[in-house]
Amino acid sequence: MSEVYKQAGVDVEKGYEAVERLKKHVARTHRPEVLGGIGAFAGAFDLSSLQYKEPVLLSGTDGVGTKLKLAIDLDKHDTVGIDLVAMCVNDIIAQGGDPLFFLDYIACGENDPSRIEAIVSGIAEGCEQAGAALIGGETAEMPGMYDPDEYDLAGFVVGIVEKSAMITGKDIKSGDVVIGLSSSGIHSNGYSLVRKLIADVDLNQTYPGLSQTVKDAVMAPTKIYAKSIQALKKEVNLKGISHITGGGFDENIPRMLPDGLGVLIETNSWDIPEVFHFLEEKGNIDNREMYGVFNMGIGMAVVVAEEDVSIALQLLEKVDEQAYVIGKVTEEEGVHFTL
Protein backbone atom coordinates (compact mmCIF):
# COMPACT_ATOMS: atom_id res chain seq x y z
CA MET A 1 0.00 0.00 0.00
CA SER A 2 1.05 3.62 -0.47
CA GLU A 3 4.10 4.56 1.59
CA VAL A 4 2.95 8.17 1.34
CA TYR A 5 -0.28 7.33 3.22
CA LYS A 6 1.73 5.56 5.92
CA GLN A 7 3.96 8.62 6.30
CA ALA A 8 0.79 10.66 6.84
CA GLY A 9 -0.03 8.47 9.84
CA VAL A 10 -2.38 5.84 8.39
CA ASP A 11 -0.97 2.30 8.39
CA VAL A 12 -3.21 0.25 6.12
CA GLU A 13 -1.26 -2.95 6.78
CA LYS A 14 -2.08 -2.69 10.48
CA GLY A 15 -5.70 -2.23 9.47
CA TYR A 16 -5.61 -5.52 7.55
CA GLU A 17 -4.01 -7.23 10.54
CA ALA A 18 -6.73 -5.92 12.84
CA VAL A 19 -9.44 -7.27 10.53
CA GLU A 20 -7.85 -10.73 10.56
CA ARG A 21 -7.68 -10.67 14.36
CA LEU A 22 -11.37 -9.74 14.60
CA LYS A 23 -12.78 -12.56 12.49
CA LYS A 24 -12.83 -15.17 15.25
CA HIS A 25 -14.61 -12.79 17.61
CA VAL A 26 -17.25 -11.86 15.04
CA ALA A 27 -17.82 -15.57 14.37
CA ARG A 28 -18.82 -16.11 18.01
CA THR A 29 -21.86 -13.88 17.49
CA HIS A 30 -23.15 -15.50 14.29
CA ARG A 31 -26.87 -16.06 13.82
CA PRO A 32 -28.40 -18.08 10.95
CA GLU A 33 -30.16 -14.96 9.66
CA VAL A 34 -26.84 -13.27 8.85
CA LEU A 35 -26.03 -13.28 5.13
CA GLY A 36 -22.44 -12.92 3.99
CA GLY A 37 -19.41 -12.18 6.09
CA ILE A 38 -16.75 -9.60 6.89
CA GLY A 39 -15.65 -7.46 3.96
CA ALA A 40 -18.92 -6.67 2.20
CA PHE A 41 -19.99 -3.06 1.86
CA ALA A 42 -23.03 -3.69 4.07
CA GLY A 43 -24.09 -6.18 6.70
CA ALA A 44 -27.14 -8.23 5.69
CA PHE A 45 -29.74 -9.81 7.98
CA ASP A 46 -32.68 -11.93 6.71
CA LEU A 47 -35.90 -11.15 8.61
CA SER A 48 -38.11 -13.56 6.67
CA SER A 49 -37.52 -16.56 8.93
CA LEU A 50 -38.53 -14.72 12.11
CA GLN A 51 -42.26 -14.99 11.36
CA TYR A 52 -43.56 -11.81 12.94
CA LYS A 53 -47.11 -10.74 12.03
CA GLU A 54 -46.57 -7.00 12.49
CA PRO A 55 -42.84 -6.56 13.04
CA VAL A 56 -41.55 -3.27 14.39
CA LEU A 57 -37.83 -2.56 14.20
CA LEU A 58 -36.29 -0.76 17.16
CA SER A 59 -32.92 0.97 16.88
CA GLY A 60 -30.52 2.50 19.35
CA THR A 61 -27.13 4.14 19.29
CA ASP A 62 -24.83 5.11 22.14
CA GLY A 63 -21.28 5.31 23.38
CA VAL A 64 -19.41 4.68 26.62
CA GLY A 65 -18.72 8.29 27.59
CA THR A 66 -15.68 9.22 29.63
CA LYS A 67 -15.38 5.73 31.08
CA LEU A 68 -13.18 5.34 28.00
CA LYS A 69 -10.73 7.85 29.46
CA LEU A 70 -10.23 5.55 32.42
CA ALA A 71 -9.85 2.54 30.12
CA ILE A 72 -7.17 4.37 28.14
CA ASP A 73 -5.34 5.60 31.24
CA LEU A 74 -5.45 2.11 32.78
CA ASP A 75 -4.61 0.37 29.47
CA LYS A 76 -7.66 -1.85 29.98
CA HIS A 77 -9.62 -2.29 26.78
CA ASP A 78 -11.26 -5.73 27.01
CA THR A 79 -14.50 -4.75 28.76
CA VAL A 80 -15.47 -1.37 27.29
CA GLY A 81 -16.92 -3.25 24.33
CA ILE A 82 -19.37 -4.94 26.70
CA ASP A 83 -20.29 -1.49 28.00
CA LEU A 84 -20.88 -0.30 24.44
CA VAL A 85 -23.27 -3.13 23.60
CA ALA A 86 -25.05 -2.82 26.94
CA MET A 87 -25.74 0.88 26.55
CA CYS A 88 -27.39 0.30 23.18
CA VAL A 89 -29.16 -3.00 23.85
CA ASN A 90 -30.62 -2.05 27.23
CA ASP A 91 -32.34 0.91 25.57
CA ILE A 92 -34.18 -1.14 22.96
CA ILE A 93 -35.23 -3.88 25.35
CA ALA A 94 -36.85 -1.15 27.46
CA GLN A 95 -39.50 -1.01 24.74
CA GLY A 96 -39.84 -4.76 24.45
CA GLY A 97 -37.35 -5.35 21.66
CA ASP A 98 -35.26 -8.46 21.09
CA PRO A 99 -31.79 -7.57 19.77
CA LEU A 100 -31.02 -8.76 16.23
CA PHE A 101 -27.73 -7.24 15.17
CA PHE A 102 -25.07 -4.75 16.20
CA LEU A 103 -22.54 -2.52 14.46
CA ASP A 104 -19.58 -0.69 15.98
CA TYR A 105 -17.49 2.36 15.13
CA ILE A 106 -13.98 2.80 16.50
CA ALA A 107 -12.12 6.06 15.90
CA CYS A 108 -8.48 6.09 16.93
CA GLY A 109 -5.30 8.07 16.60
CA GLU A 110 -3.26 5.00 15.74
CA ASN A 111 -4.42 1.54 14.73
CA ASP A 112 -2.95 -0.83 17.29
CA PRO A 113 -4.22 -4.29 16.20
CA SER A 114 -3.89 -5.83 19.67
CA ARG A 115 -5.85 -2.99 21.26
CA ILE A 116 -8.52 -3.09 18.55
CA GLU A 117 -8.82 -6.84 19.08
CA ALA A 118 -9.27 -6.36 22.84
CA ILE A 119 -12.03 -3.81 22.24
CA VAL A 120 -13.86 -5.97 19.70
CA SER A 121 -13.52 -9.08 21.85
CA GLY A 122 -15.56 -7.19 24.45
CA ILE A 123 -18.09 -6.12 21.84
CA ALA A 124 -18.45 -9.75 20.76
CA GLU A 125 -18.89 -10.83 24.39
CA GLY A 126 -21.63 -8.23 24.80
CA CYS A 127 -23.32 -9.38 21.60
CA GLU A 128 -23.26 -12.98 22.82
CA GLN A 129 -24.87 -11.93 26.09
CA ALA A 130 -27.53 -9.99 24.18
CA GLY A 131 -28.15 -12.60 21.47
CA ALA A 132 -27.21 -10.10 18.75
CA ALA A 133 -25.04 -10.73 15.70
CA LEU A 134 -22.08 -8.43 15.13
CA ILE A 135 -22.58 -7.84 11.40
CA GLY A 136 -20.42 -4.83 10.65
CA GLY A 137 -18.20 -2.07 11.88
CA GLU A 138 -15.68 0.60 11.04
CA THR A 139 -12.25 1.32 12.44
CA ALA A 140 -11.14 4.81 11.46
CA GLU A 141 -7.49 5.69 11.98
CA MET A 142 -7.48 9.48 12.37
CA PRO A 143 -4.02 10.91 13.12
CA GLY A 144 -4.21 14.54 14.11
CA MET A 145 -7.78 14.12 15.31
CA TYR A 146 -6.79 11.83 18.20
CA ASP A 147 -3.51 11.27 20.01
CA PRO A 148 -1.92 7.87 19.24
CA ASP A 149 -3.26 6.24 22.42
CA GLU A 150 -6.74 7.79 22.21
CA TYR A 151 -9.89 6.29 20.75
CA ASP A 152 -13.65 6.68 20.89
CA LEU A 153 -16.45 4.16 20.44
CA ALA A 154 -19.98 4.26 19.11
CA GLY A 155 -22.43 1.42 18.75
CA PHE A 156 -25.67 0.84 16.89
CA VAL A 157 -28.20 -1.92 17.52
CA VAL A 158 -31.35 -3.03 15.73
CA GLY A 159 -33.98 -5.13 17.45
CA ILE A 160 -37.47 -6.35 16.71
CA VAL A 161 -40.80 -6.53 18.51
CA GLU A 162 -44.34 -7.50 17.56
CA LYS A 163 -46.28 -4.26 17.24
CA SER A 164 -48.89 -5.41 19.77
CA ALA A 165 -46.14 -6.33 22.25
CA MET A 166 -44.36 -2.98 22.37
CA ILE A 167 -43.83 -1.81 25.94
CA THR A 168 -44.83 1.85 26.13
CA GLY A 169 -46.02 2.37 29.71
CA LYS A 170 -49.51 3.43 28.60
CA ASP A 171 -51.26 0.88 30.85
CA ILE A 172 -49.35 1.71 34.04
CA LYS A 173 -51.64 2.82 36.86
CA SER A 174 -51.39 3.87 40.48
CA GLY A 175 -50.73 0.88 42.73
CA ASP A 176 -48.59 -1.01 40.22
CA VAL A 177 -45.31 -2.32 41.59
CA VAL A 178 -41.76 -1.38 40.60
CA ILE A 179 -39.24 -4.23 40.53
CA GLY A 180 -35.55 -3.32 40.36
CA LEU A 181 -32.96 -5.50 38.62
CA SER A 182 -29.54 -5.24 40.19
CA SER A 183 -26.70 -3.45 38.44
CA SER A 184 -23.11 -4.64 38.24
CA GLY A 185 -21.89 -1.31 39.58
CA ILE A 186 -21.66 2.17 38.10
CA HIS A 187 -22.31 0.91 34.55
CA SER A 188 -21.38 3.62 32.01
CA ASN A 189 -22.85 6.89 33.26
CA GLY A 190 -21.61 9.61 35.57
CA TYR A 191 -17.95 9.05 34.78
CA SER A 192 -17.01 12.70 34.44
CA LEU A 193 -17.95 12.99 38.11
CA VAL A 194 -16.39 9.62 38.99
CA ARG A 195 -13.06 10.61 37.44
CA LYS A 196 -13.08 13.87 39.38
CA LEU A 197 -13.79 12.06 42.65
CA ILE A 198 -11.00 9.51 42.21
CA ALA A 199 -8.42 11.86 40.68
CA ASP A 200 -6.19 11.66 43.77
CA VAL A 201 -6.83 7.97 44.48
CA ASP A 202 -4.48 5.05 43.84
CA LEU A 203 -6.70 2.96 41.57
CA ASN A 204 -4.78 -0.23 42.30
CA GLN A 205 -5.49 -0.04 46.03
CA THR A 206 -8.46 -0.96 48.18
CA TYR A 207 -9.90 1.58 50.60
CA PRO A 208 -12.09 1.38 53.70
CA GLY A 209 -15.54 0.26 52.59
CA LEU A 210 -14.30 -1.27 49.33
CA SER A 211 -13.62 -5.00 49.09
CA GLN A 212 -11.93 -4.66 45.67
CA THR A 213 -9.51 -2.23 44.10
CA VAL A 214 -10.87 1.08 42.89
CA LYS A 215 -9.87 0.05 39.36
CA ASP A 216 -11.98 -3.10 39.51
CA ALA A 217 -14.91 -1.24 41.04
CA VAL A 218 -15.05 1.54 38.47
CA MET A 219 -14.28 -0.62 35.43
CA ALA A 220 -16.86 -3.35 36.08
CA PRO A 221 -18.70 -3.84 32.77
CA THR A 222 -22.32 -2.79 32.37
CA LYS A 223 -24.88 -5.54 32.81
CA ILE A 224 -26.94 -6.58 29.78
CA TYR A 225 -30.56 -7.38 30.66
CA ALA A 226 -31.78 -8.92 27.38
CA LYS A 227 -32.18 -12.50 28.57
CA SER A 228 -33.76 -11.50 31.89
CA ILE A 229 -36.36 -9.34 30.17
CA GLN A 230 -37.01 -12.05 27.58
CA ALA A 231 -37.72 -14.52 30.38
CA LEU A 232 -40.18 -12.09 31.98
CA LYS A 233 -41.99 -11.19 28.76
CA LYS A 234 -42.98 -14.79 28.11
CA GLU A 235 -45.16 -15.06 31.21
CA VAL A 236 -45.68 -11.60 32.71
CA ASN A 237 -47.36 -8.46 31.42
CA LEU A 238 -44.53 -5.95 31.63
CA LYS A 239 -46.26 -2.58 31.75
CA GLY A 240 -43.14 -0.46 31.66
CA ILE A 241 -39.35 -0.72 31.64
CA SER A 242 -36.78 1.92 32.52
CA HIS A 243 -33.06 1.67 31.79
CA ILE A 244 -31.40 3.57 34.65
CA THR A 245 -28.66 5.46 32.82
CA GLY A 246 -27.55 9.11 32.76
CA GLY A 247 -29.58 11.16 35.21
CA GLY A 248 -30.24 8.21 37.48
CA PHE A 249 -33.73 7.58 38.79
CA ASP A 250 -34.87 11.18 38.39
CA GLU A 251 -34.36 11.29 34.63
CA ASN A 252 -35.19 7.73 33.63
CA ILE A 253 -38.10 6.48 35.73
CA PRO A 254 -40.48 9.18 34.40
CA ARG A 255 -39.67 8.16 30.81
CA MET A 256 -41.79 5.02 31.20
CA LEU A 257 -44.71 6.64 33.07
CA PRO A 258 -47.92 8.15 31.70
CA ASP A 259 -48.56 11.80 32.53
CA GLY A 260 -49.93 12.35 36.02
CA LEU A 261 -48.17 9.41 37.68
CA GLY A 262 -44.99 9.07 39.71
CA VAL A 263 -43.21 6.50 41.83
CA LEU A 264 -42.22 6.15 45.46
CA ILE A 265 -38.89 4.33 45.76
CA GLU A 266 -38.01 2.51 48.99
CA THR A 267 -34.24 2.92 49.08
CA ASN A 268 -33.80 0.43 51.92
CA SER A 269 -35.30 -2.38 49.83
CA TRP A 270 -32.05 -3.38 48.11
CA ASP A 271 -28.35 -3.59 48.88
CA ILE A 272 -26.56 -0.53 47.50
CA PRO A 273 -23.15 -1.55 46.09
CA GLU A 274 -20.22 -0.33 48.14
CA VAL A 275 -18.73 1.68 45.27
CA PHE A 276 -21.58 4.19 45.57
CA HIS A 277 -21.00 4.65 49.30
CA PHE A 278 -17.31 5.16 48.53
CA LEU A 279 -18.05 7.83 45.91
CA GLU A 280 -20.66 9.54 48.09
CA GLU A 281 -18.21 9.83 50.97
CA LYS A 282 -15.28 10.79 48.74
CA GLY A 283 -17.18 13.70 47.24
CA ASN A 284 -19.27 14.56 50.29
CA ILE A 285 -22.32 14.25 48.04
CA ASP A 286 -25.85 14.54 49.40
CA ASN A 287 -27.44 11.09 49.45
CA ARG A 288 -30.55 12.26 47.61
CA GLU A 289 -28.42 13.76 44.86
CA MET A 290 -26.73 10.41 44.27
CA TYR A 291 -30.03 9.02 42.96
CA GLY A 292 -30.14 11.78 40.35
CA VAL A 293 -26.72 10.85 38.97
CA PHE A 294 -26.11 7.12 39.47
CA ASN A 295 -28.10 3.88 39.26
CA MET A 296 -27.28 3.14 42.93
CA GLY A 297 -27.39 -0.61 42.30
CA ILE A 298 -30.52 -0.78 40.14
CA GLY A 299 -29.70 -0.91 36.44
CA MET A 300 -33.20 -1.56 35.16
CA ALA A 301 -36.66 -1.12 36.66
CA VAL A 302 -39.84 -2.83 35.47
CA VAL A 303 -43.46 -2.14 36.37
CA VAL A 304 -45.95 -4.97 36.84
CA ALA A 305 -49.39 -5.36 38.37
CA GLU A 306 -49.35 -6.34 42.05
CA GLU A 307 -50.71 -9.81 41.26
CA ASP A 308 -47.74 -10.48 38.94
CA VAL A 309 -44.99 -9.64 41.43
CA SER A 310 -44.49 -13.15 42.78
CA ILE A 311 -44.18 -14.87 39.40
CA ALA A 312 -41.93 -12.09 38.09
CA LEU A 313 -39.50 -12.53 40.98
CA GLN A 314 -39.54 -16.32 40.52
CA LEU A 315 -38.77 -16.00 36.80
CA LEU A 316 -35.91 -13.62 37.47
CA GLU A 317 -34.46 -15.94 40.10
CA LYS A 318 -34.51 -18.79 37.56
CA VAL A 319 -32.24 -16.80 35.23
CA ASP A 320 -29.95 -15.78 38.12
CA GLU A 321 -31.11 -12.17 38.07
CA GLN A 322 -31.06 -10.50 41.48
CA ALA A 323 -34.23 -8.45 41.78
CA TYR A 324 -36.10 -6.53 44.45
CA VAL A 325 -39.47 -4.90 44.94
CA ILE A 326 -38.28 -1.30 45.19
CA GLY A 327 -41.41 0.82 45.06
CA LYS A 328 -44.90 1.59 43.84
CA VAL A 329 -46.55 3.78 41.24
CA THR A 330 -48.41 6.71 42.81
CA GLU A 331 -50.64 9.57 41.70
CA GLU A 332 -47.98 12.11 42.71
CA GLU A 333 -45.89 13.00 39.68
CA GLY A 334 -42.13 12.68 39.86
CA VAL A 335 -39.76 10.32 41.62
CA HIS A 336 -39.89 10.31 45.41
CA PHE A 337 -37.76 8.42 47.89
CA THR A 338 -37.87 7.11 51.43
CA LEU A 339 -34.24 7.85 52.36
Curated annotation (Swiss-Prot):
It catalyses: 2-formamido-N(1)-(5-O-phospho-beta-D-ribosyl)acetamidine + ATP = 5-amino-1-(5-phospho-beta-D-ribosyl)imidazole + ADP + phosphate + H(+). Keywords: ATP-binding, Cytoplasm, Ligase, Nucleotide-binding, Purine biosynthesis. The keyword Ligase applies. Its EC number is 6.3.3.1. It is an enzyme of class 6 (ligase). It is found in: Cytoplasm. Pathway: Purine metabolism; IMP biosynthesis via de novo pathway; 5-amino-1-(5-phospho-D-ribosyl)imidazole from N(2)-formyl-N(1)-(5-phospho-D-ribosyl)glycinamide: step 2/2. Pfam families: AIRS, AIRS_C. GO terms for biological process: 'de novo' IMP biosynthetic process; adenine biosynthetic process. GO terms for molecular function: ATP binding; phosphoribosylamine-glycine ligase activity; phosphoribosylformylglycinamidine cyclo-ligase activity. Its main location: cytoplasm. One of its GO terms (cellular component) is cytosol. SUPFAM superfamilies: PurM C-terminal domain-like, PurM N-terminal domain-like. Belongs to the AIR synthase family. NCBIfam families: purM. This is Phosphoribosylformylglycinamidine cyclo-ligase. The lineage of its organism: Bacteria, Bacillati, Bacillota, Bacilli, Bacillales.
